[in-house]
Regions:
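Short glycine/serine/threonine-rich phosphate/pyrophosphate-binding segments
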Residues: 27, 85-92, 113, 227-228
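A generic, well-ordered mixed alpha/beta core segment in the N-terminal half of proteins
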Residues: 78-81, 85-99
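ATP/NTP phosphate-donor binding region
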Residues: 1-76
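Active-site segments that bind and position negatively charged phosphate/pyrophosphate groups
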Residues: 177-288
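Hydrophobic/aromatic beta-strand patches that form the interior of the parallel beta-sheet core
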Residues: 44-46, 79, 104-106, 141-144, ...
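A glycine/threonine-rich phosphate-anchoring loop and its flanking beta-alpha core
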Residues: 92-182
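Residue-level signal for inorganic ion chemistry
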Residues: 18, 56, 107, 145, ...
Length: 341
């Protein structure tokens, strides 16, 4: 209800392009457009479908063309409203249209509020893998309203909780135990504080390493295996959070066996994942396809790859391994359906 007040603090123009997830448009589109128009703005809407399929060059091209049709100039403003997909493709459009224009982000899913809306990473996918074309481009503002989460179903809420668990694993033991011990009702009551804690963790890391060359890689805990799973199943079988949950558990399982991780940590991760209905068993996948996806991982450096592990709950570490050793250690044979690595 107060978004125009904040916009006027950072934007003196009148024309706004609203890039919005179509489901969010159905829920809130009329309200936000009416609010903006009543406060003197001219609004043009670009609605996109949710899901990873919209993080494509084809959708990006359609956004560019609509921005041109609307005569959006470099001095105008883009508002991106939706979950992680809308934020990624809408943010990348803002970063590249006319060599970059201002945008603000209104994240509407838990995952977007605690993770993808913070830090300035924007990207689209290629058929070969996730987030292969992208940039670092900071929005002028991110406006987080936990009340927008009331329309999320349980699976989508838990999708976001997977990223909260990630933050707890790499940086905040107290948050981990809070997530493990609080009831569902208590989690709901404390969600604003949980969001703030996660944003604070990420914000501090990003301020130290905006371009992802050092400690920001810690935010990729679970993502190396997780992205493989998402790509392998064409972004259809598992949500992002579910794939990351499987990645966190299995990377820690092997890390504990190898002696990098304190004994018993894998079991604790399993406990908290099960509490939020998140999977942990690695699905059946072909090793050749896994290797192709790993070869494109952005943490690869020549024949090596940076792997994110945890020594203990709240203590993430970066381990540089040869891709050959990593593949042999973590994918020793074709995985069997329903089993861990």
């Amino acid at each position: 209800d107060n978004i125009s007040y904040f916009i006027k603090g950072i934007y003196r123009g009148k024309k706004i392009a609203l890039i919005i997830d179509e489901n969010v448009d159905n829920l809130y589109g009329c309200k936000i457009r009416t609010h903006l128009i009543d406060n003197g703005f001219s609004v043009k809407t670009i609605s996109i479908r949710g899901g990873e399929g919209s993080k494509s060059l084809r959708i990006l091209d359609s956004i560019y063309r609509k921005l041109l049709d609307f005569n959006i100039t470099r001095g105008d403003l883009i508002i991106v409203m939706g979950g992680g997909v809308a934020g990624d493709v809408g943010g990348f459009a803002a970063a590249t249209y006319l060599r970059g224009m201002d945008f603000i982000h209104i994240p509407t899913t838990l995952l977007a509020q605690i993770d993808s809306s913070i830090g300035g990473k924007v990207a689209v996918n290629l058929p070969e893998g996730k987030n292969l074309v992208g940039s670092f481009y900071q929005p002028k503002g991110v406006f987080i309203d936990p009340n927008l989460l009331c329309t999320l179903d349980t699976r989508e809420f838990n999708n976001g909780m997977a990223e909260a668990i990630k933050y707890a694993c790499i940086a905040d033991k107290n948050l981990f135990h809070q997530l493990l011990m609080l009831s569902k009702e208590e989690i709901d009551r404390e969600i604003e504080d949980i969001i703030f804690t996660c944003c604070n963790i990420k914000g501090k890391i990003v301020m130290e390493d905006e371009k992802d060359r050092g400690n920001r890689m810690l935010l990729n805990f679970g993502h190396t295996i997780g992205h493989v799973i998402e790509k392998y199943f064409n972004y259809e079988k598992y949500t992002h959070g579910e794939a990351i949950a499987i990645g966190m558990y299995n990377i820690t399982l092997k890390s504990e066996i190898a002696g990098y991780t304190k004994e018993g940590i894998t079991h604790q991760i399993k406990e908290v994942l099960e509490k939020f209905g998140l999977p942990y068993r690695l699905p059946d996948m072909d090793r050749g396809e896994i290797l192709k996806t790993l070869a494109l991982d952005k943490k690869s450096k020549g024949n090596n790859i940076d792997i994110i592990l945890i020594k203990d709950i709240g203590e993430g570490i970066i381990k540089n391994l040869s891709r050959k050793i990593f593949f042999k250690e973590f994918f020793p044979h074709k995985t069997k359906s329903g089993g861990a690595i």
